[in-house]
Amino acid sequence: MIKKIVGNNIKNIRKEKKVSQDYIAEVALLDRGQLSKIESGKVNITIETVAKIAQALNVNVSCLFVNSQLNEPKPFVKWAGGKTQILSELKKYIPEKFNTYYEPFLGGGALFFALQPEKAVINDLNVHLMNAFKCFEDETAYHDLIKRLKLHENKNSEQYYYSVREQDREADFWKKSISEIGARLIYLNKACFNGLYRENSSGYFNVPFGKKEKVNCFDLENFNAIFNYFKQSKIKILSTTYQDAIKNAKQNDFIYLDPPYDVYPDKTGFVSYGKDGFDAQAQRDLAECFKMLSNKGAYVMLSNHNTPLIQELYQGFNIRVIHAKRMINSKGTGRGAVEEVIITNY
């Protein structure tokens, strides 16, 4: 546990300071390969080596032993469009103070978990996903969720996967408990091909089996962190349209809009999470919503691809171009660096 904490802290501080492994290895008189293993938490490390690395990073050695991630909730599903990769960029533009936090296109909720707002309204059209989130509000549902996930882990096989996948075709599917629906969503997310959520035209999940002999559906420490956070906060969980989700937003509230992204002119970019899609007109409607919220005096931040349409729609607002890695795509070749924008009205 300690070597993972130290390794993770070394890596994070090094990246924050924008220095290479080669530089740290040279200054600390280490082999670069050894430093890489240390950062991965794969090797034991002496206090003398920690001290050398701390000196190379110009930080107090105690900083490398702090478990900064202890009890900090993180996304429990892998989700297309997830923001874990650009969290450091997003955090640069968070308002210093705000009242209620709104995230109407939640997905995995990377920014939501990173901010841990005391008051929040979270929403996603995917009712399966939001049932999983609702399990963290109720102790009985929470423990049942864990019980069901353990069962999925033990039964995992290709045949079992497809039997679980077909459940939403059943007429009485929505009579199931939130923990059963939530556990199904999480299991399918962990066991499916490439962690990709996709629905067919009828609204049924249709991603094939990922051919994993063993699946780990949950991290108990993270689940407990999420459960404790929800218990100590006022979180309203919805599964409705984004317009409905933000209708009560007021002055000094903070709204983060992370819609399905606009496509590039060459039609690249995985944006079809659900059966309804999100076309150019939907992007225009969202831009009007952005302006409406701005006129209310709310803080609004939006993420999207850096396309001509998005540049046109948000003229007059603060547009910052960043580079991000696309981590989930139906084709492995569709992953790589892409230009995104972070747009704010402040």
Task: Place the predicted regions along the sequence by residue.
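S-adenosyl-L-methionine
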Residues: L70-T100, A110
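SAM-dependent nucleic-acid methyltransferase catalytic core
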Residues: N71-Q85, D138-Y256, P260-F270, D285
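Recognition helix of helix-turn-helix/homeodomain-like DNA-binding domains
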Residues: L29-V43, V66
